[in-house]
Structures are given as C-alpha cells and as structure tokens.
C-alpha cells in the first residue's frame, strides 16, 4: 500500500511536469505566432508607407513637370533641342542611380543584389522598353500634323485603357469588375476634364491621326507594363542597379534620336543652344520623375502609376489658375469628380 501511494505520487508529479512543459510549449508557440504576425504587420506597414511616399512624389513631380515645360518655352516655342534635353535627363538618371549605389556599397558592402555587374541574360531585356519609348516619342512629333495640342491631350487618354488591357495580358494580373469600372471612369474623367471649345475637332481627326494615337497608346502601355515585369522579375535586386541599366540604354537611344532629328541644328548651334535655368530645372524634374516612376513600378504597379499621373494632370490645372490665369471650366469640375469616384472604386475593388 505504501509502495502504491508513493507510485501514485510520482505519477502525479510526472503528469504535473508534462502539463507544465505543455503549457510552456503553448506559450512559446503563441509567442512565436504573435512575433511572426507582428513582423508581417510591420513589413506591410513599411511597404504601404513606401508606396505612399513614391506615389505622392510622382504625383507632385508630374504636376510640376508640365508647368516647367511651359516656362521653358519662349514665344510659344522651344529654343533648345528637346532631344538633347532628353539625353541629359537619361544621363542625370544614370548619375543619380550610381550615386545611390555608391552610398549603399559604402554602408552595406557589395552583395549579389546590389552588384552593378550582371549577366547578359539579365541585361538583354533592358533595351526593349528604351526602343519602344524612342518610337513612341518619334511618333509624337508626327501626330501633330493631324491633330492639334488639345486634341492630342485627349487622345493620350487611350494610354489608360491600353495599360489596363496589357497589364492583364502580359502580367496575368486580374482587376476586379469594380476596378475595371473605375479604370474606365478614370479615362472618361480625364477626357471630360480636358474638354474645351475646340474639343469637337478630335472627332474630325483623320484615319492616320487615329492610327498614330492608338499605336502610341499601345507602345506606351506595353513599355510601361514590360518595364514593370523586368523590375519585378527579381524582387531582391536593388532598384538602383535596375534603373542604371534601363537608363544606360535610354541614353543610347536618345543619342540616336539626336542624330535622326536634330543633328544639323546641334552641329551648327551647339549642344546647349537655347538652354536656360528653367530648362535645367525641367531636366532635373524629368530625371527625378523617371526614378519615381520606376520605384512605383517596383513597389506598387502600373495601375497606381496611371492614377498618379491622372491626378497630377488635375493638380497641374489647379496650379495653372494661379500661375497662368487659367480658367477652370464646368467640364473640368465634372471630370475631376469622376476621377475622384474612380480612385475610390479602385481602392474599394482592392479591399474586396
């Protein structure tokens, strides 16, 4: 009996120890889950903050871009060569990317993800968007033979639809029905906001004009979506390395554009003929805008970029009221309202 009593006490102690260990295990497991959840939440907050910062930066830079372009003109004309300005934009973007990489190498050292040297398989895809943008920019000069400037701004909104369609086809990303409705409303809102007394001429645009507008929209949409695919193919790759290779080929194709369009003018008048302080500010703005675009593609997507640039268009019009005595029409307020509804629908579609 004494033996059984002692044995029962031992069994009870062992059971208590087992329960204690189980309790500790559950506590540790719960703690690990809580830590993991906290880590994921913190990471998501950082990503949202990063997306918000680069999107706001792109919106502000894009809205000021049009104002600087207007200021850079004299008597309604560019006294400087647009192609040389584009070349300098690419050069500055390369320099800024290298500067950022230099700081990273100094602070973190050289790793596989931030190493500038790369393989041919990784680099060979970067010339494609540069070539697409070159052809698109060349078409931009010829389309004005068939449509005026206000009409061109309206036809440019075809980029919105082409980006959405190519985003679905190339990246295999689905947009919800609500998001598609928001996207179509965005195109309608931007078009409505740009309507004026001369807008009826758009319907009178000839077949070559419409063809060029559609081709330009497809080139722009494809280049943007393809660039996003390149940048996101290797998520861990440092964005500054990817930017550098994108901009190097962009510089090369801009050099080709100088030879094709402005070789005689540059040879006779000089590379920097007609440049002013405003021109230099415009070049800096374009360079920073380009970097902001690539960061939006890296941390967000082309859809966010389209919304950002569309909101920037409206912001430019509002600022122009104070700078250029620009008068906002009823169509602008109606279009702005439609764009706001579109932004809400896109956000609501994501939440679902």
Swiss-Prot record:
Recorded superkingdom: Eukaryota
Q: Which residues cross the membrane?
A: 52-72, 82-102, 125-145, 175-195, 211-231, 239-259, 277-297, 314-334
UniProt cross-references to InterPro entries, sorted A to Z:
Nuc_sug_transpt (IPR007271)
Cell compartments where the protein resides: Golgi apparatus membrane
Q: Where is the signal peptide?
A: none
Which Pfam families has this protein been placed in?
Answer: Nuc_sug_transp
Instruction: Write out the topological domains of type Lumenal.
Output: 73-81, 146-174, 232-238, 298-313
Keyword Transferase recorded: no
Q: How does it sit in the membrane?
A: Multi-pass membrane protein
Which ranges make up the Cytoplasmic topological domains here? 1-51, 103-124, 196-210, 260-276, 335-352
Q: Report a single Gene Ontology molecular function.
A: transmembrane transporter activity
Principal location class = Golgi
Q: Which UniProt keywords apply?
A: Golgi apparatus, Membrane, Sugar transport, Transmembrane, Transmembrane helix, Transport
One biological-process term from Gene Ontology?
sialic acid transport
Can you list the GO cellular component terms from the UniProt entry?
endosome; Golgi apparatus; Golgi membrane; trans-Golgi network
Which function does this protein serve?
Answer: Sugar transporter involved in the transport of CMP-sialic acid from the cytoplasm into the Golgi. Essential protein.
Q: Which family does it belong to?
A: Belongs to the nucleotide-sugar transporter family. CMP-Sialate:CMP antiporter (TC 2.A.7.12) subfamily.
- In Swiss-Prot or TrEMBL terms, this protein is called CMP-sialic acid transporter 4
Organism equals: Arabidopsis thaliana (Mouse-ear cress)
| Upper lineage | Eukaryota, Viridiplantae, Streptophyta, Embryophyta, Tracheophyta
């Amino acid at each position: 009996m004494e033996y059984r009593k002692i044995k029962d006490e031992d069994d009870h102690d062992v059971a208590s120890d087992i329960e204690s260990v189980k309790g500790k295990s559950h506590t540790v497991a719960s703690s690990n889950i809580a830590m993991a959840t906290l880590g994921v939440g913190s990471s998501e907050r950082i990503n949202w903050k990063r997306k918000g910062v680069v999107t706001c930066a792109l919106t502000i830079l894009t809205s000021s871009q049009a104002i600087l372009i207007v200021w850079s003109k004299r008597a309604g004309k560019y006294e400087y060569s647009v192609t040389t300005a584009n070349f300098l934009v690419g050069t500055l973007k390369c320099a800024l990317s290298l500067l950022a990489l230099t700081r990273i190498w100094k602070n973190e050292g050289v790793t596989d993800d931030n190493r500038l040297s790369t393989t041919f398989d990784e680099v060979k895809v970067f010339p494609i968007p540069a070539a697409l943008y070159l052809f698109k920019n060349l078409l931009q000069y010829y389309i004005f033979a068939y449509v005026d400037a206000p009409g061109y701004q309206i036809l440019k909104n075809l980029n919105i639809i082409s980006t959405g369609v190519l985003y679905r086809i190339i990246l295999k990303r689905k947009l919800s029905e609500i998001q598609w409705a928001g996207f179509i409303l965005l195109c309608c809102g931007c078009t409505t906001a740009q309507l004026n007394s001369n807008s009826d001429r758009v319907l009178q645009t000839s077949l070559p004009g419409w063809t060029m507008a559609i081709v330009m929209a497809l080139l722009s949409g494809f280049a943007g979506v393809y660039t996003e695919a390149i940048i996101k193919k290797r998520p861990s790759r440092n964005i500054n390395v990817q930017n550098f290779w994108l901009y190097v080929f962009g510089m090369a194709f801009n050099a080709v554009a100088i030879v094709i369009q402005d070789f005689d003018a540059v040879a006779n008048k000089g590379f920097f003929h007609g440049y002013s302080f405003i021109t230099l500010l415009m070049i800096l703005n374009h360079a920073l805008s380009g970097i902001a675009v690539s960061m939006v593609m890296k941390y967000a997507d082309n859809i966010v970029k389209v919304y950002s640039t569309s909101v920037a268009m409206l912001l430019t019009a509002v600022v122009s009221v104070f700078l250029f005595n620009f008068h906002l029409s009823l169509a602008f307020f109606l279009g702005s309202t439609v764009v706001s509804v579109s932004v809400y629908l896109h956000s609501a579609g994501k939440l679902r």
